[in-house]
């Protein structure tokens, strides 16, 4: 399980897919991979937008390249990178304390923009 350390959440996700197989994710198509790589290259060359950004990643991330995320966020003047200790890829499907911190940080970002 590369998604979450929360066993109950993972069991719930598995039950959802068993009950509704159409919700399951398959592998990407070659067309999707090609388009994604093209977009990633374009975004890597572009400067960070002049906007606030919150990026929350799990410390144990094994799906996306955490080093690339760290590098991008280091170049984002209004960006904030939070690494959640012990978390996997899906921080909003993690244990309650991780999920709550992530949602609180997002709400604080939105509140700051509304002020």
Language model features: what each stretch is:
Residues 1-52:
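Alpha/beta-hydrolase
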Residues 24, 61, 98:
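Glycine-/small-residue-rich active-site loops that bind phosphorylated ligands and cofactors
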Residues 79-115:
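Catalytic active-site module of serine/aspartate enzymes centered on a nucleophile-bearing elbow/loop
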Residues 62-65, 92:
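Nucleotide-sugar-dependent glycosyltransferase donor-binding/catalytic pocket residues
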Residues 51, 65-74:
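Short alpha-helix in the alpha/beta-hydrolase fold that links the catalytic acid
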Residues 31, 35, 71, 101, ...:
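Alpha-helical elements of Rossmann-like donor-binding domains used by nucleotide-donor carbohydrate transfer enzymes
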